[in-house]
Amino acid sequence: PQDLKYSGEDSFLEIGNFNTFRENVTISKGTKDGGMTTSIKDNNLFMTGVHIAHDCKINNNNIFVNQVTLGGHVNILDNVVIGGLSAVIQFVTIGSYSMIGGMSGIDKNVLPFSLAIGNRAKLRGLNLVGIRRNNFNKDEIKKRNSIHESFINRKIELSTNDKVEAIFYEYKSILNEELGHIQK
């Protein structure tokens, strides 16, 4: 593992089924501070030169375009696309069905269904392309757009935790799983 605290203890890399690793992909094993395991679930595509640091958790059906770099302890949920030459700082979670534009620097959690672009990346709206590709119907898209707009464009000044609580209360039925990774 590429962690200065690593002192030779047994650590692991778990890789699921149907993943594709192109040329020069590097993946670091886990460390003591991250449960000793880096894990990659199923059906992910890692294009040329991708780097996955220690203790990352990568779920299913994700695409990492050329030269994407993940810092340690990053969580990538399901159906995420990260554009080429993008970097994600350590301890960040990227929500399901999100898309990160190429050459972006991600230094904060990214909400599910979001489109984030830039250095430092900003949320630019709903990832409609990804949502449509995954066969969400019009009502589901409307609900997610409403949630996204509520979170991003709240007129009242609230802390992030207060925003999350308010939105959970308002849209509880579909948010439990989709935003459950954001901790108070």
Which residues fall in each region the model found?
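Structural signal for interior beta-strand "rungs" in well-ordered beta-sheet cores
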Residues: P1-K122
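Terminal amphipathic alpha-helical/low-complexity segments used for targeting or macromolecular assembly
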Residues: K5-Y6, F12, F18, F113, ...
